[in-house]
């Protein structure tokens, strides 16, 4: 083996040992609460990306999704979903330098008996990102990526 290969292998081994020693583990799928094993999703917009992400995560965790108006199952209600973009800073030419994306979801959960288990629970997330007008296409892609990350984080918080 060459010296570079040995160093690379030694560095990888040292990093692995350091991570193991500090207790780091990869995030594992969290078990679903029992109440969400069979669930109906109600939302103002059932075609929203949030609802699609929720459905995918619920199915992946082993939940059974039931059609609307099914009785005897829990109901996950997405009552509000909003996304806003605000200007945070301007440069010396009064051009936008940074934006902040806000993402808000309000949800509730009713049990199979119709009793509220979780009432109007808000999730408020935000991220700041730099904007360069010289790279407007890249900035639009970055904004889309941040929006999808915020949505995925909201899904994790709901479940």
What residue ranges belong to the model's regions?
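Sec/Tat-exported extracytoplasmic proteins
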Residues: 43, 58-62, 109-113, 133, ...
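C-terminal/domain-edge helix-coil "capping" segments
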Residues: 137-159
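Surface-exposed short loop/turn segments
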Residues: 77-122, 126-144
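Bacterial N-terminal signal peptides that target proteins for export
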Residues: 1-11
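Bacterial signal peptide processing site
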Residues: 23-26
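N-terminal segment of the mature soluble domain
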Residues: 37-82
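Acidic/histidine-rich, surface-exposed loop or edge segments in extracytoplasmic proteins
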Residues: 34-42, 135-139
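C-terminal motif of bacterial Sec signal peptides marking the signal peptidase cleavage site
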Residues: 18-21
């Amino acid at each position: 083996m060459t010296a570079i290969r040995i160093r690379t292998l030694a560095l990888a081994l040292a990093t692995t040992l350091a991570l193991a020693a500090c207790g780091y583990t990869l995030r594992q799928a969290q078990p679903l609460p029992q109440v969400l094993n069979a669930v109906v999703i109600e939302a103002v917009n059932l075609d929203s990306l949030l609802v699609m992400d929720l459905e995918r995560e619920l199915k992946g965790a082993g939940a059974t999704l039931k059609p609307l108006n099914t009785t005897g199952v829990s109901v996950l209600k997405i009552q509000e979903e909003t996304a806003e973009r605000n200007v945070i800073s301007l440069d010396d030419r009064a051009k936008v330098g940074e934006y902040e994306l806000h993402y808000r979801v309000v949800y509730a959960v009713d049990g199979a008996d119709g009793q509220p288990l979780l009432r109007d629970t808000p999730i408020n997330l935000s991220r700041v990102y730099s904007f360069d007008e010289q790279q407007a296409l890249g900035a639009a892609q970055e904004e889309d990526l941040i929006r999808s990350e915020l949505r995925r984080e909201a899904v994790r918080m709901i479940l």
